Amino acid sequence: MRIALKIAYDGTKFYGFQRQPDLRTVEGELIKVLKKLGIIEDVKEANFKGASRTDRGVSALGNVIAFNTAKPELAEARILNHHLRDIWILGKAEVPEDFHPRFWAKNKIYRYYLFDEGIDVIKLKACAEAFLGRHDFSNFARLEEFRKPVREINRIDVFSRGRIIVVEIEGKSFLWEMTRRIITALKLCGLGVLSIGDVELMLKEKVDKKLPPAPPENLVLWEVGYEGIKFEVDAYAIEKVKREFLERFRKYLTKSAILEDWLISL
């Protein structure tokens, strides 16, 4: 039986998603636990695949993995989450034998969290319009030989939440560092460093120097969408995950308040 799992993880605790020798990665930890519980024995035989190989520091609330197993009853959120740290199983689905979480994806949604450093949100939103549609993103990505640079952005939504600006980007597929380089452009537009015309030119012509990618820690792979795949949710497991998220939220919020007071006092 082939099983797909929807997963969340704190990317700051890992050296990226993809397995690397002697480094803690999301894929490596998942495979280790799946083998430990006897859910899979061999990675190749299990045809283990992931939807997105997120970079070091990038987190996820909706990445997806899939594998073949003779013990699907053990691939449950409450069982797996007990053995995982900084990774959480949020849903499970039985999928066709040829299901590949990357190639079957209908869309991917990313969220980036920007601290408002005097950013003009109206200018940022206007700049976002330039990225919509189908473009050559060579100037906004770290290119790989085997991947074509043309991609399509379905939508970019921008909304403020206190001192944080959230940018949500949706497309079918993304190039390496593409999302984070788009974010850099949007931020610079919002700060008045770049104009919409500059961005439009970069989408049409090659440039000598590319914009750097925005820091990975503020990027979240929010969702990977599929046609006809419905993930079952274990309510008990989700409640445990929410409690853990709440504890982390309290910790970071308190630390944020301390740092704010230090800044005010100095």
UniProtKB/Swiss-Prot annotation:
The role this protein plays is:
Formation of pseudouridine at positions 38, 39 and 40 in the anticodon stem and loop of transfer RNAs.
Report residues binding substrate.
Y110
GO term, biological process aspect, one? tRNA pseudouridine synthesis
Query: Which Pfam families does this one have?
Result: PseudoU_synth_1 (PF01416)
Catalytic residues? D55 (nucleophile)
In terms of domain of life, where is this protein from?
Answer: Archaea
Q: Read off the lineage from the record.
A: Archaea, Methanobacteriati, Methanobacteriota, Thermococci, Thermococcales
- A GO MF term: tRNA pseudouridine(38-40) synthase activity
| Keywords linked to the UniProt accession | Isomerase, tRNA processing
The protein here is known as: tRNA pseudouridine synthase A
Reaction catalysed by this chain? Answer: uridine(38/39/40) in tRNA = pseudouridine(38/39/40) in tRNA
Q: Which InterPro entries does the record match to this protein?
A: PsdUridine_synth_cat_dom_sf, PsdUridine_synth_TruA, PsdUridine_synth_TruA_a/b_dom, PsdUridine_synth_TruA_C, TruA/RsuA/RluB/E/F_N
Q: Which Enzyme Commission numbers does its entry carry?
A: 5.4.99.12
Q: Family assignment?
A: Belongs to the tRNA pseudouridine synthase TruA family.
